[in-house]
Amino acid sequence: MFLGTYTPKLDDKGRLTLPAKFRDALAGGLMVTKSQDHSLAVYPRAEFEKLARRASQASRSNPEARAFLRNLAAATDEQHPDAQGRITLSADHRRYASLSKECVVIGSVDYLEIWDAAAWQEYQQAHEENFSAATDETLRDII
């Protein structure tokens, strides 16, 4: 399970060191793709394959489903962490997420998110007040 908040630096070559506690779960390969709110999502390869299979089962006659599948496939990059646990983020991914040297990696249970540190701080400030209400509304039937 991916949990917690980490603050690795992005180096000049576009490499980001993944948190050590997640490296074993990602050692078999990982998929980096664009996500909501101009962040990046990092999935273990097996989890991403499940997501892609589910997405590909949608009707190809549905324009939204086709667009989603196209964007998902086109925006995804397979990575294998190096010996230091670093992955190289593509220029397109860095641009999409407006990544500076200061990054934040957050656990999102079954995947990781990569954010620019300033964007993550802004996101948190904008959503902090709604956290309790969202918890009540969203999780009412689960918890």
From Swiss-Prot:
Protein name: Transcriptional regulator MraZ
Key words of the record: Cytoplasm, DNA-binding, Repeat, Transcription, Transcription regulation
PANTHER family: TRANSCRIPTIONAL REGULATOR MRAZ
UniProt cross-references to HAMAP family, sorted A to Z: MraZ
One Pfam family hit: MraZ
Keyword Cytoplasm in annotation: yes
Lineage per the UniProt record: Bacteria, Bacillati, Actinomycetota, Actinomycetes, Mycobacteriales
CDD domains documented for this protein: MraZ_C, MraZ_N
Family statement: Belongs to the MraZ family.
GO-annotated biological processes: negative regulation of DNA-templated transcription initiation
